[in-house]
Amino acid sequence: MNNREITSLWSRIIIEELVRLGAGFFCISPGSRSTPLTVAAARHPEAAWKMFPDERSAGFFALGYARATQKPAVLICTSGTAVANYYPAVVEASMDCQPMLILSADRPFELLETGANQTIQQFGIFGGYSRWNFRLPEPSSDVPLRSVITAIDHAVSSATGSLPGPVHINVPFREPFEPLDPDLHDPWLAPVSEWIDTSTPLCRTLSQERVPNRESISSLRKIIAESKLPFMIAGRLNNRSDSLAVGNLARSLNIPLYADLSSGLRLDSSFNPLQLAFQSSQFPERFRPDTVIHFGGPLVARQPSAAVRMWNPRNHIVIKPHANRFGPDHNITLSIEASPALIAEALLGCRTPLPSGCQPLPEPFFQQAKAEIDICCLPDHPVSEISAARIVSSLVTPESGLFLSNSMPVRDMDLYASPSASRPFMTGMNRGASGIDGIISTAAGFAKGLRKPVTLMIGDIAFLHDLNALSLLPSLQVPLCIVVLNNNGGGIFSFLPVASEKDVFETCFATPQSYSIKAAAETFGIESSRPATNRDFEECCRKAAESDRCSIIEVKGNRRNNVELHRTLQSKITALGASYLSR
């Protein structure tokens, strides 16, 4: 068997085992050194794949796909700086425990650190952000094929195990590496002949949910039963079963629940949005739970964590599915690594439901706060960043998805969304490292993984940051509606103290831009609109939801007016809360 045959077979075996293990979606970027892997993936009858001229965009697309499916997409790239472009997406995936697999083709060992063209030190490039790094040997009949297959088995296991995240496999190839059908009767294949004749992986890892032990459940039930005023927080929950179980627990025991936007429960109409209550500084002073039970990951807003820090409750319990460290305030008294759904189900019936008087604020407060927000959404009023969030939240359904960019879009949706859903639905956001890079690519991957229409809300700077990702949309096969909140710059900085530094604020922080969103959409063949009123905006959103094509809706705003609207509305809600708390 010659080198071309060995290399072709080597690559086909890698791709075959990945497909058998359920990692059958490939994000491929063109390149010469990765030819064997690309051809093997493209020709596999059960593999799905998409091409990405930009590896950075590919990395974020794979991240979004993982968020939607909890399965790793496989990234394939050539040698050199190509793999380095995955770095931002790898950081986000690692920080937020999202599975990802990277196959980077490389030059052979003898060319490393010799000045050879397109050759860098690729192995270990992601440092501590990778769950496992491995360098396969150059394809050779001296290498047992079973060792190659089991390396792939371990890679998938590491990416999807108890602490999911990115895994990097470096795959060096010597020339020539053009594909050539190998001799399948070669003696080199004898040790894997049974594997070839089946469709099952050589070695499967049977991972199981982190099951709570009896002692954990017993301790938790006792703590909650003896608590005078328990309080629940739902942080980031990665699947619908966790969201359903946590929501059911709060409802059955009538325990007040702070549902973060990333929990999937923020838009559940059976829970009042406590984000509004936390706008009043008096609220955490008057409402003092003795037990806080936090399910899942971190929160979008700072106020709840600040309140817990001030409360210093006797019991501060965190239930999280992974072994990553969590708790920047260092005030957790009990940390349990287990499935949030299993814990929540095991706590049902642990005490009699709390009386209605134990809720943080009475129902009329939330109704009046809702009325204040809804004034911003009157049909003939100009569409604003607040009304856009409110309207989008009222239109999304469990049959669709929602993705939020960092900076103001995620904060506005968390605070001003309208609870209108009857059950949890998928909400995506990159809150591991909270960057604004790669948002369109991530949302596109999220839509691909969900196989459902998705609405993305994004600011103009984040939109421009990932502009080339618009090239992915015409062939996405799933409608993605991008709502661009265009306030001519970085709107969030207008809320920060640096806004008073007049000599540097506009040029160094707000960074105003004058690019045409419409022209960008036209360049990539995407329909766009710019509604002026809330009525027009809602009509555009409904039209986008009924379409099978991707679209862009531009909400043109003014940063100064936006700050004024936010502060006016916030002061009204704060005053409203204070009036109820003083009674």
Swiss-Prot record:
<protein>
    <recommendedName>
        <fullName>2-succinyl-5-enolpyruvyl-6-hydroxy-3-cyclohexene-1-carboxylate synthase</fullName>
        <ecNumber>2.2.1.9</ecNumber>
    </recommendedName>
</protein>
<comment type="similarity">
    <text>Belongs to the TPP enzyme family. MenD subfamily.</text>
</comment>
<dbReference type="InterPro" id="IPR029061">
    <property type="entry name" value="THDP-binding"/>
</dbReference>
<dbReference type="InterPro" id="IPR012001">
    <property type="entry name" value="Thiamin_PyroP_enz_TPP-bd_dom"/>
</dbReference>
<keyword id="KW-0464">Manganese</keyword>
<comment type="subunit">
    <text>Homodimer.</text>
</comment>
<keyword id="KW-0786">Thiamine pyrophosphate</keyword>
<dbReference type="InterPro" id="IPR029035">
    <property type="entry name" value="DHS-like_NAD/FAD-binding_dom"/>
</dbReference>
<dbReference type="Pfam" id="PF16582">
    <property type="entry name" value="TPP_enzyme_M_2"/>
</dbReference>
<dbReference type="GO" id="GO:0000287">
    <property type="term" value="F:magnesium ion binding"/>
</dbReference>
<dbReference type="InterPro" id="IPR004433">
    <property type="entry name" value="MenaQ_synth_MenD"/>
</dbReference>
<dbReference type="InterPro" id="IPR011766">
    <property type="entry name" value="TPP_enzyme_TPP-bd"/>
</dbReference>
<comment type="pathway">
    <text>Quinol/quinone metabolism; 1,4-dihydroxy-2-naphthoate biosynthesis; 1,4-dihydroxy-2-naphthoate from chorismate: step 2/7.</text>
</comment>
<dbReference type="GO" id="GO:0070204">
    <property type="term" value="F:2-succinyl-5-enolpyruvyl-6-hydroxy-3-cyclohexene-1-carboxylic-acid synthase activity"/>
</dbReference>
<dbReference type="GO" id="GO:0030145">
    <property type="term" value="F:manganese ion binding"/>
</dbReference>
<dbReference type="GO" id="GO:0009234">
    <property type="term" value="P:menaquinone biosynthetic process"/>
</dbReference>
<dbReference type="Pfam" id="PF02776">
    <property type="entry name" value="TPP_enzyme_N"/>
</dbReference>
<comment type="function">
    <text>Catalyzes the thiamine diphosphate-dependent decarboxylation of 2-oxoglutarate and the subsequent addition of the resulting succinic semialdehyde-thiamine pyrophosphate anion to isochorismate to yield 2-succinyl-5-enolpyruvyl-6-hydroxy-3-cyclohexene-1-carboxylate (SEPHCHC).</text>
</comment>
<dbReference type="InterPro" id="IPR032264">
    <property type="entry name" value="MenD_middle"/>
</dbReference>
<keyword id="KW-0460">Magnesium</keyword>
<keyword id="KW-0479">Metal-binding</keyword>
<comment type="pathway">
    <text>Quinol/quinone metabolism; menaquinone biosynthesis.</text>
</comment>
<dbReference type="Pfam" id="PF02775">
    <property type="entry name" value="TPP_enzyme_C"/>
</dbReference>
<keyword id="KW-0474">Menaquinone biosynthesis</keyword>
<dbReference type="GO" id="GO:0030976">
    <property type="term" value="F:thiamine pyrophosphate binding"/>
</dbReference>
<keyword id="KW-0808">Transferase</keyword>
